[in-house]
Structures are given as structure tokens and as C-alpha cells.
């Protein structure tokens, strides 16, 4: 399969468990921008099993703790883009963990809505 997420190099992986892996985004929108993905190739969040969702959640907590200690962000945006119209560019389900910092945008109210504009 020709999927960039299915072919991650071991040294790129920050954390992993039986069903998921976490790594830094190769095109970050902020310092520490990370992704958590299922090991199994599936296109979107809605294709994940309950077990995969639980594994992704478990790793998201580890990533947050790591980012808190390393980068000291002031907040986070997290979420999944689904399909091309929803902003998904790699058709392998992935959770974005985007650290936010005071002053990174003029008025952060509205969170992700501001990033998208």
C-alpha cells in the first residue's frame, strides 16, 4: 500500500501501543503539532473500531503530557478532518493534536474556526 502513514520510519514514532502510533506532523501549524493514527489502514474516524478509538485516546493523553513538558503550550486544538471536503489530505484516519500559544493568532476565540479562516 502506498500510504505515507502506513510506512512510518520507527525513528519518527513518539509513542505507540498495540493499535495506534503518535508522531510529529511533517507540516506543523504550530510547534509540537502531532498526529495519532491507527496502525490499521482505514480512511476516516468513522471507520475506526471502538478499540482503536480507545487506543488513540490513550496515546493522545501521552502526547499531551509530553508536549506540556517540552513546549509548555497555553491550549490545544484536537480533532479529525474527514474526507477531502473536510480538509483531510492523507486518507488514513488521523487525530491532530495542535498546541496553541498565547499570541499565535490575534483573537483565538472560536478555536479551530479561526485557524480555518
Each PLM stretch: what is its role?
Residues 1-117:
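HIT superfamily nucleotide-processing domains
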Amino acid at each position: 500500500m502506498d500510504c505515507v502513514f502506513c510506512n512510518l520510519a520507527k525513528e519518527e514514532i513518539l509513542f505507540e501501543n498495540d493499535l495506534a502510533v503518535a508522531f510529529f506532523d511533517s507540516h506543523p501549524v504550530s510547534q509540537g503539532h502531532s498526529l495519532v493514527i491507527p496502525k490499521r489502514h482505514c480512511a476516516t474516524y468513522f471507520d475506526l473500531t471502538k478499540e482503536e478509538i480507545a487506543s488513540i485516546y490513550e496515546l493522545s493523553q501521552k502526547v499531551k503530557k509530553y508536549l506540556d513538558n517540552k513546549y509548555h503550550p497555553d491550549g490545544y486544538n484536537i480533532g479529525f478532518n474527514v474526507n477531502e471536503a473536510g480538509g483531510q489530505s492523507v486518507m488514513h484516519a488521523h487525530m491532530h493534536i495542535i498546541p496553541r500559544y498565547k499570541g499565535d493568532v490575534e483573537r483565538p476565540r472560536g478555536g479551530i474556526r479561526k485557524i480555518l479562516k
